[in-house]
Amino acid sequence: QSTFHDDNYTNNVRLGAMSNWALILNPKNKIEFRNIFNQLATKETVIRKGELFENGLELSNQSFRYEQKSILSSQLSGTHELSEKTNLKWISGLGYTQRSEPDFRRFTSSRPMGSGEAYRIDLQQFESPTLQQAARFWSNMDEYVLTGTVNMEQILGKKNIVDEMNKVLKVGVYTEYKDRYFKARWFGIVNPNRVDASITSQKPEDFFSNDNL
């Protein structure tokens, strides 16, 4: 039997910006430039306290996580009335998405139930790390998208003042190029040499320092 209580602390910060521009060259030609940018940052800390009665242990598990997401979308387009019966519209676009999780840390720690001792971080005693005990995770993803579209409309025959009565031939082309780069690594800290409590009883910020690796 076991009991647990979780405290979850989350902080979100969001930033957004939008910019739209239009250049009207004349009544028959217009150029537009649209941009939108969003960024979201999330910081999360989870502290779990509990008792593992069958093993006679008090547990204190913690995780620290930061994630950042960015999205940029830009579009340059043009609308042109080439003649009374011919219209041309083109759109070029750029999209960028970025997601970063620079250092996700988590660990479990325990002490004998009712002892009042300092918690000791639990480590695997052999060379087989896990993602649950004293682990760190890094990931980064960048994605680029380029798009291009050209559409043309040609009214066939005599133009009717009622648009719905016109016979219209529509042709278009669309192209897209996408490139994605993703990298992820994780490390699990093990204790095959049985280091003493002076290391495993450290505070998380000290335990995860480079001096202990």
Show which residues each predicted segment covers:
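Transmembrane beta-barrel wall of Gram-negative outer-membrane proteins
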Residues: 1-45, 72
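Hydrophobic, lipid-facing positions within transmembrane beta-strands of outer-membrane proteins
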Residues: 13-19, 70-76, 92, 144-152
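Outer-membrane beta-barrel translocator domains and adjoining extracellular loop/strand segments
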Residues: 1, 44-51, 101-109, 182-188
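Transmembrane beta-strands of outer-membrane beta-barrel pores
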Residues: 37-41, 94-100, 140, 144-146, ...
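Short loop/turn motifs that connect adjacent beta-strands in outer-membrane beta-barrel proteins
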Residues: 27-28, 83-87, 157-168, 184
